[in-house]
Curated annotation (Swiss-Prot):
Residues 452-487 have a biased composition (Basic and acidic residues). Changing A389S: In strain: JS. It comes from Human parainfluenza 3 virus (strain Wash/47885/57). Forms the helical nucleocapsid (NC) in a ratio of 1 N per 6 ribonucleotides, protecting the genome from nucleases. The encapsidated genomic RNA serves as template for transcription and replication; encapsidation by N is coupled to RNA synthesis. Forms the encapsidation complex with the phosphoprotein protein P. Before encapsidation, the newly synthesized free N protein, so-called N0, is chaperoned by P. Together with P, inhibits the integrated stress response (ISR) in the infected cell via the formation of inclusion bodies (IBs) shielding its own newly synthesized viral RNAs. This is Nucleoprotein. Residues 1-403 are annotated as: Ncore. One of its GO terms (molecular function) is structural molecule activity. Residues 450-515 are annotated as: Disordered. Changing E104R: In strain: JS. RNA binds at K179, K189, R194, Y259, Y349, R353. Disulfide bonds: none annotated. Homomultimer; forms the nucleocapsid. Binds to the viral genomic RNA. N0 interacts with the phosphoprotein (via N-terminus); this interaction allows P to chaperon N0 to avoid N polymerization before encapsidation. Interacts as N-RNA template with the phosphoprotein (via C-terminus); this interaction positions the polymerase on the template. Residues 457-466 are annotated as: Interaction with the phosphoprotein.
Amino acid sequence: MLSLFDTFNARRQENITKSAGGAIIPGQKNTVSIFALGPTITDDNEKMTLALLFLSHSLDNEKQHAQRAGFLVSLLSMAYANPELYLTTNGSNADVKYVIYMIEKDLKRQKYGGFVVKTREMIYEKTTEWIFGSDLDYDQETMLQNGRNNSTIEDLVHTFGYPSCLGALIIQIWIVLVKAITSISGLRKGFFTRLEAFRQDGTVQAGLVLSGDTVDQIGSIMRSQQSLVTLMVETLITMNTSRNDLTTIEKNIQIVGNYIRDAGLASFFNTIRYGIETRMAALTLSTLRPDINRLKALMELYLSKGPRAPFICILRDPIHGEFAPGNYPAIWSYAMGVAVVQNRAMQQYVTGRSYLDIDMFQLGQAVARDAEAQMSSTLEDELGVTHEAKESLKRHIRNINSSETSFHKPTGGSAIEMAIDEEPEQFEHRADQEQDGEPQSSIIQYAWAEGNRSDDRTEQATESDNIKTEQQNIRDRLNKRLNDKKKQGSQPSTNPTNRTNQDEIDDLFNAFGSN
């Protein structure tokens, strides 16, 4: 029988890893032009002007996405003293072939400020005109926030220096990557949220903040050009973080890289954190056993990917779909139940998925609130916890959890409607059990965390009483004012202002009825 189980496990492993084989046939590649600055360009203002020009070309809708991505690569490579070496190290890709052109400054030429595109000694006039003579939709005024009110490039470079200004542009492109692939709808919001930290520490100057439309355009390029994303991921992988001479730009790239790592795998790692690593007794349930075995196989697959494992979703690795929580719904539902109890921030996590197992979700919450389940016997022995301290800790946990005897609802998605539709039946079922004297389920005895209905009725009654009291106060004030008017004289006043006040009093008095 045990050998049969081993066979099943081997079949599951093969189904996940999908053993490779067959011949390697090269595919078609796009030829993409990359532009690097030559040694004749030494002025910092000119370098920054070219950086903004590359960004403008990347936003030009008249160009193909592959070439627009090439201009972004040109901008990213400006962070390095040797762009050719950077592209040789990180630019190997199955989709594109990079061709590097140099931009030089020829003092004998007056057109386009003396800039010229060349390779070795060959000058490309048409390419020069294509880059420097094009009418672009985006310029400094449109691709940067409040461009017309920003300082000039010369002012920014003079104040902050060229490396700092260039780094401000490059780091924003990296921030776009955080959400560009895994969360399209939250791209703009996520970008400005993460950008705020870099604005506060002075990394990104206010005059160089990208506009929201620019962020969306760059995100669109990243989604359509996997070669650009691959280059950026390879940059993170090959960057030697143990070096002592990392530039400021490289350090900031590493900071953003922490957000990019494991992007799209939050459900997988939250399941392991709250479902497996908590090591509660519920893991012994046979219902969870298949999903636990699948998690084990997935973790082995993840580790087999080596340094590229944290980026399987960003790189759109064919196996990244195996890590979706729909492939292990029972243990995921249980883990989310534990999570919403142990970590309040997880109560905002979208758990209302179509594959959510409500029973497992409730079980996770019930187990997480249980004082005995929260204590590890292994750690008790290791730490030398006395019996009295253990009982005291249990008592404290019970006191804390005594006010939380209701289940948290799943948030977002179709499971909310499903839970609400089932709720009246659950209440009715509990009422029948109480009448028949039958024992209640340890799971169903919890209500959804929305407050008792009696509390709602009490709030409504209190609100109604407050309204009646306020109405009575208004009546009393109106009566008092009316009596004062009568005492002043029995004849009605001919003053228009007094007449208006009297009409207003009469209308208000009639609106609330007679006393």
